[in-house]
Amino acid sequence: MPDMLTLWTDIKALFEENNSKTAYATWIETAKPIALDGNKLTLELPSPLHRDYWTHQHLDQQLVEYAYQAAHEDIQPVLILENERQQQATLKAKTAPVAAGEPVEPTPTFMKETALNSRYTFDTFVIGKGNQMAHAAALVVSEEPGVMYNPLFFYGGVGLGKTHLMHAIGNKMLEDRPDTKVKYVTSEAFTNDFINAIQTRTQEQFRQEYRNVDLLLVDDIQFFANKEGTQEEFFHTFNALYDDGKQIVLTSDRLPNEIPKLQDRLVSRFAWGLSVDITPPDLETRIAILRNKADADQIDIPDDTLSYIAGQIDSNVRELEGALARVQAYSQLMHQPIATDLAAEALKSLNLANASDAVTIPVIQDRVAKYFDVSLKDLKGKKRKKAIVMPRQIAMYLSRELTEASLPRIGNEFGGKDHTTVIHAYDKITESLKTDPQLQKDIDSLKDDLRR
């Protein structure tokens, strides 16, 4: 096992890669490693607010997964505040060691019950244009599991509400039918459980744990990529549940057919139900999300300040809520009421001013249209002239390369075209770049222009 600082550095790198800049700067970078005792990593957090966030947003569970990726060790986090250090030391001193020679029965980690986040409900979910279809489908599944949309597959960028809806389904089913057996797990946790079952020779218990449920929720299944053994096991788990009429809900950052090295038979089964795209919230929805969060956390904040924060961040809900929490923490530290000026000061170090300059599909369309001297109407239209088709394909290629938009969303921005059209355009440009130096020059010029 690596030493504490090396382990924490590796874990932080994975946190930074998989979380927004705001969330990382506010919640992860402020954590301080204190001790690595066996498989327990003690982290000191600066405030109770931070510890609540780590728990409610499942950062502790993410840490377990990232530690396994970094060191192939089952590391469990212990979250303490600075004034609890002495209490932690006392507790450690009172812990009696296991008697020498006494056999310890290995307990597979998958036997531990996975709890849903009680705060993730349909009541606390803010509906907007980008998620209303996903919300409607989730509600249907929670009321009639295993009937209409099975599996239900949510896909979209980080922090847009996929996990919230997944938990909301589980919470609603448990509210309506308390005897419902619900299992929520991330794909990495599923993989770790599977590996643990092999190592402890408890494969049968593993299968009972995952197949004897009424609702299986699996988050971030894109991490099944390149894991042949895990995919094989999940294939049989999926079949067992589906054949028994049990509901399956999955999330990913992309469509199943876009996940590299995902078995065709899994791609096919994931398509049996309904796949729903969740897109970033518009301004009105972002303001509503912030107001909802402020009311839930009893934060006294003016409407104009909420509008200011919503105007600064347009990427995802997680980053929005992270910004609000940062403003709240800054207000408490400065002993000042929250106002727009204070919010601007609190968010200044995040360089959010650059967020408005981020590359978007409309910006790409505008630059490509001007570069090739075609109209936006033609670029997004159906004309098949070569002088228009090539710029259109280049714009689709750049949209795929420079934004996090899904294939259906890109197609929608180009006059409602099917996602297969986007795939064809991307593949066409990718192939042409290998033999066409002028095309390479055009692409490079456009990329330079878009990144300035």
Curated annotation (Swiss-Prot):
Tell me where in or outside the cell this protein is found: Cytoplasm
According to its UniProt record, where is this protein mainly located? Answer: cytoplasm
Q: Does the keyword Cytoplasm apply?
A: yes
Q: Where is this region: Domain IV, binds dsDNA?
A: 332-452
Report residues binding ATP: G159, G161, K162, T163
A single cellular component GO annotation: plasma membrane
Q: Which GO terms describe its biological process?
A: DNA replication initiation; regulation of DNA replication
Q: What does the record give under GO molecular function?
A: ATP binding; ATP hydrolysis activity; DNA replication origin binding; lipid binding
Q: What PROSITE patterns would the database entry show?
A: DNAA
Gene3D superfamilies named in the record = 1.10.1750.10, 1.10.8.60, 3.30.300.180, P-loop containing nucleotide triphosphate hydrolases
- Keyword annotations for this protein? ATP-binding, Cytoplasm, DNA replication, DNA-binding, Lipid-binding, Nucleotide-binding
Instruction: Name the family.
Output: Belongs to the DnaA family.
* Complexes and interactors: Oligomerizes as a right-handed, spiral filament on DNA at oriC.
Report the protein's function: Plays an essential role in the initiation and regulation of chromosomal replication. ATP-DnaA binds to the origin of replication (oriC) to initiate formation of the DNA replication initiation complex once per cell cycle. Binds the DnaA box (a 9 base pair repeat at the origin) and separates the double-stranded (ds)DNA. Forms a right-handed helical filament on oriC DNA; dsDNA binds to the exterior of the filament while single-stranded (ss)DNA is stabiized in the filament's interior.
Name of the protein described by the UniProt record: Chromosomal replication initiator protein DnaA
| Organism name | Levilactobacillus brevis (strain ATCC 367 / BCRC 12310 / CIP 105137 / JCM 1170 / LMG 11437 / NCIMB 947 / NCTC 947) (Lactobacillus brevis)
